[in-house]
């Protein structure tokens, strides 16, 4: 996934960077770095396991600890 695809996925899931980070078992800083422009020195390419999890979440999988917000399931 590209940095723009990761950000689009996070937004489609209705998650803040810290919430997606919790679901991926990483720090929020890591999510922000994966979403940053590849030309930035702090940009990070997501690990394969993270991409698989994001795709599973986009397909509708929700673990028991999925963030809950008012008006969102």
Where are these regions (language model features)?
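A short, Lys/Arg-rich alpha-helix, primarily the initiator
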Residues: 1-12
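Conserved hydrophobic/aromatic packing and binding residues within compact polymer-binding modules
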Residues: 6, 20-21, 31-34
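The DNA-contacting recognition helix of HTH DNA-binding domains
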Residues: 17-18, 28
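Recognition helix of helix-turn-helix/homeodomain-like DNA-binding domains
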Residues: 25-43
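Short, basic-rich loop-to-helix N-cap that marks the start of a DNA-contacting helix
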Residues: 38-55
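Short, charged recognition helix plus adjacent turn
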Residues: 39-40, 56-73
